[in-house]
Regions:
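Short, low-complexity disordered leader/linker segments with a strong preference
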Residues: 1-44, 66, 421-424, 428-436
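Short, well-ordered beta-strand elements
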Residues: 38-50, 71-76, 101-102, 148, ...
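Mature extracytoplasmic/periplasmic domains
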Residues: 63, 119, 281, 316-400
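Extracytoplasmic "Venus flytrap"/periplasmic binding protein-like
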Residues: 63-135, 168-170, 269-272, 286-287
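Extracytoplasmic/periplasmic substrate-recognition and gating elements
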Residues: 93, 169, 245-251, 286-353, ...
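Hinge/lid segment of periplasmic solute-binding proteins
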Residues: 104-158, 183-187, 212-214, 294-298, ...
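Extracytoplasmic/periplasmic solute-binding protein
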Residues: 144-152, 157, 167, 182-229, ...
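Glycine-centered hinge/linker elements that transmit conformational signals in sensory
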Residues: 186-190, 226-255, 298
Length: 436
């Protein structure tokens, strides 16, 4: 099996199966059959994360049911790895039994699916317009000019920071706006000196920071055509250099898992958290720190002219599996909910801290409300603004496979290896791996 198929299996989400039964045949068979078909119709949705994606799907289900009470919608919780395995086992064999009508798929994974199994996904161009969503989100779900997914959550990057620690170090909130990484390191050194706190956490096995730096410059591990782009990737070189500068400045705290990461800022061990907007609920768990946090735009790499104060990490979209049997109804469900419903987006902002990539959501009531924990800052409005500034990149088919290899390359450079030679070597290795 070619590497493309293998990586599609490893790098995507999955889908489950819904049944539609039709019955009835008496003297008034036309009306009877139509009613029976409608009342027996069932959609199945697969997603992961009970507190976020599943809750969103269930709230969408409730809204859809108001106008479509005869369509049953089942929302199924599955681990993302299980979704990946089940979807690809079925798609690779051409068997659709047990698959859902609608599935949530991560942005980093979808290109692998669409390139390998395009004919198995429904064209959603008639229910979702690219202009209605943040450009970087629709850039990942299109093939041949057709939109195959309804964008969902924004993973827009931001700089969460402790205002009290920044001020103790002699800086103001204005100093945190329009940051460059050089300025950030300068502030971090002062924070370390004045407070004894680290500025941020870094996990050597997770290249999330480099990924965000890359996208801030409109770059990735692959170029616009999806080809491996490592050896001559100036944005990648700038990102690795910035990463090394952070470590060399002595302002980082090393973590190795999620609990350590969250514990570091909840316990007041770091002064800032540069990551996706989805971290906000975790930051807010430290209720004793209410009023001591603010949010600024993600820093840019000053040495790279393409880098901006906006990036992304994570995010997903909703997709319809065409051959399960309820394509039209599944598309109608998405059209009436995630593709257009501002009331739903407004409610999800309150219930799960969703930052929607539907542009019109920025006009929703909850997006202009101040959040007490962040000193009254209208964080959803800021997130929405930054979301629309995120550069669009081609994530390619193999992001995670490439990054597994690049982790070794980054650590080699951190250990003193020549960057140009290291990246040239890894260009060859990665090209060989994805060509198999």
């Amino acid at each position: 099996m070619k590497m493309k198929k293998v990586l599609a299996i490893l790098l995507a989400g999955a889908m489950t199966f819904g049944l539609m039964a039709c019955s009835g045949s008496d003297s008034k068979e036309t009306d009877s059959k139509d009613t029976a078909a409608k009342s027996d119709e069932k959609l199945t949705i697969w997603a992961w994360d009970e507190s976020f994606n599943i809750k969103a799907a269930n709230e969408a289900k409730e809204i859809y049911a108001e106008k479509n009470p005869d369509v049953e919608v089942e929302v199924v919780t599955m681990a993302q790895d299980d979704i990946v395995a089940k979807l690809n086992t079925s798609l690779s064999s051409g068997s659709y039994d047990g698959l859902p009508d609608i599935v949530l798929i991560e942005d980093y994974r979808i290109q692998g699916y669409l390139n390998a199994y395009q004919d198995d996904f429904s064209d959603l161009s008639d229910i979702a317009s690219a202009g209605d969503f943040a450009e970087y989100k629709t850039g990942v779900n299109q093939i041949d000019g057709k939109i195959y997914g309804v964008p969902f959550d924004s993973g827009v990057a931001a700089m969460f920071y402790r205002t009290d620690l920044i001020e103790e170090a002699g800086y103001t909130q204005d100093d945190m706006n329009d940051l460059t990484w050089d300025k950030y390191i300068e502030i971090g050194k002062a924070v370390k000196e004045k407070t004894g706190k680290a500025m941020l956490t870094l996990d050597p096995s997770d290249l999330g920071q480099i990924r965000m730096m890359l996208q801030s410059a409109g770059a990735w591990y692959t170029d616009a055509d999806g080809k491996v782009d490592i050896a001559d990737n100036q944005a990648l070189k700038d990102a690795i250099t910035t990463y090394k500068n952070l470590v060399d400045a002595g302002i980082t705290k090393t973590t190795s898992d999620w609990d350590q990461f969250v514990g570091a800022f909840n316990n007041g061990e770091v002064a800032s958290v540069p990551t996706g907007c989805w971290i906000s609920p975790s930051v807010m768990k430290a209720e004793d720190q209410s009023g001591k946090w603010a949010v600024a735009a993600f820093p840019k790499m000053a040495e790279n002219p393409d880098s901006v104060n906006a990036s992304s990490i994570g995010g997903a979209g909703w997709y319809v599996l065409k051959n399960v049997g309820h394509e039209d109804t599944a598309k109608e469900f998405l059209k009436e909910t995630f593709a257009s419903n501002i009331d739903l987006m407004n409610q999800l902002a309150a219930d799960i801290n969703l930052v929607s990539t539907l542009k019109a959501s920025s006009e929703a009531e909850n997006y202009s409300k101040g959040v007490e924990f962040y000193g009254g800052q209208e964080i959803f409005g800021d997130f929405a603004e930054w979301t629309n500034e995120v550069p669009s990149v081609n994530y390619g088919e193999n992001t995670y496979a490439i990054e597994d290899m690049m982790t070794e390359a980054v650590q080699a450079v951190m250990g003193g290896a020549d960057m140009d030679k290291t990246l040239t070597d890894y260009q060859t290795q990665v090209e060989a791996a994805v060509a198999q």
